């Protein structure tokens, strides 16, 4: 660094926050630039967009009925009917055909709620 830039740097270190903000405004006006949009901002925004897409891919979950103990079949059948809206025969076929997906493409909250209900009824459930 040259002596001149060292001297400017030392002067800047002594400025208060209010004085520094005023200096920024004066520099923006004098040189016709803006301190609000840094050059790397575009790269950061693009990276944030890619990260958001990765998160979006994980917003849909499948609730899979893995196993139903014989003594819990009726309780699980009632819960499956409530969750899916299926008729008695369709729900019975689904429960007896485990492992089978109960709900597909649902939100994480819905998937966790369904899993909790099914587990309370005695079923073994996974969320994928």
UniProtKB/Swiss-Prot annotation:
SUPFAM superfamilies: ClpS-like (SSF54736), Ribosomal protein L7/12, oligomerisation (N-terminal) domain (SSF48300). One of its GO terms (biological process) is translation. InterPro entries: Ribosomal_bL12, Ribosomal_bL12_C, Ribosomal_bL12_C/ClpS-like, Ribosomal_bL12_oligo, Ribosomal_bL12_oligo_N_sf. Gene3D superfamilies: 3.30.1390.10, Single helix bin. One of its GO terms (cellular component) is cytosolic large ribosomal subunit. Keywords: Ribonucleoprotein, Ribosomal protein. GO terms for molecular function: mRNA binding; structural constituent of ribosome. It holds the Pfam family Ribosomal_L12_N. Homodimer. Part of the ribosomal stalk of the 50S ribosomal subunit. Forms a multimeric L10(L12)X complex, where L10 forms an elongated spine to which 2 to 4 L12 dimers bind in a sequential fashion. Binds GTP-bound translation factors. Belongs to the bacterial ribosomal protein bL12 family. Forms part of the ribosomal stalk which helps the ribosome interact with GTP-bound translation factors. Is thus essential for accurate translation. This is Large ribosomal subunit protein bL12. It comes from Synechococcus elongatus (strain ATCC 33912 / PCC 7942 / FACHB-805) (Anacystis nidulans R2).
């Amino acid at each position: 660094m040259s002596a001149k830039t060292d001297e400017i740097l030392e002067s800047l270190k002594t400025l208060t926050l209010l004085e520094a903000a005023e200096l920024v405004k004066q520099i923006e006006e004098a040189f016709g630039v803006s301190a609000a949009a840094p050059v790397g901002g575009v790269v950061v925004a693009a990276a944030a967009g890619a990260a958001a897409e990765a998160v979006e891919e994980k917003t849909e979950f499948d609730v899979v009925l893995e196993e139903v103990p014989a003594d819990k079949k009726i309780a699980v059948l009632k819960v499956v009917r409530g969750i899916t809206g299926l008729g008695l025969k369709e729900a019975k076929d689904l429960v007896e055909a485990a492992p089978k997906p109960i709900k597909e493409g649902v939100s994480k909250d819905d998937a966790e709620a369904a899993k909790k209900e099914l587990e309370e009824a005695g079923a073994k459930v996974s969320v994928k």
